[in-house]
């Protein structure tokens, strides 16, 4: 069997990982083994945080809505219940943006819901 020299291939593979780790601190950007571990961990963290971002934004929208609705004397869960009862289909993102950017329209929406549900 003939001998296969993999020097160039192995070097390219290692160099690819090290190039990905530019900007990492300490040995994570210099030593291959440490760099490879940090690179794998960064991919894992990126995957987790892409999914956590959705959760965090939903939490933010709900807390913004809750604070806006409490100014009118309701809480978030009652507000969402009345929205569904009224047949208004607006998601939490749009509602929270309305409450921040255009409070007047948000108040009109609230009064419309209140009149429909007879608070």
Swiss-Prot record:
UniProt gene name: rpl20
One CC-aspect GO term: chloroplast
Function per UniProt: Binds directly to 23S ribosomal RNA and is necessary for the in vitro assembly process of the 50S ribosomal subunit. It is not involved in the protein synthesizing functions of that subunit.
Pfam family, one: Ribosomal_L20
Protein family according to the UniProt entry: Belongs to the bacterial ribosomal protein bL20 family.
Coiled-coil region list: none
Cellular compartment(s): Plastid, Chloroplast
Protein keywords: Chloroplast, Plastid, Ribonucleoprotein, Ribosomal protein, RNA-binding, rRNA-binding
Protein name: Large ribosomal subunit protein bL20c
Predominant place of localization: plastid
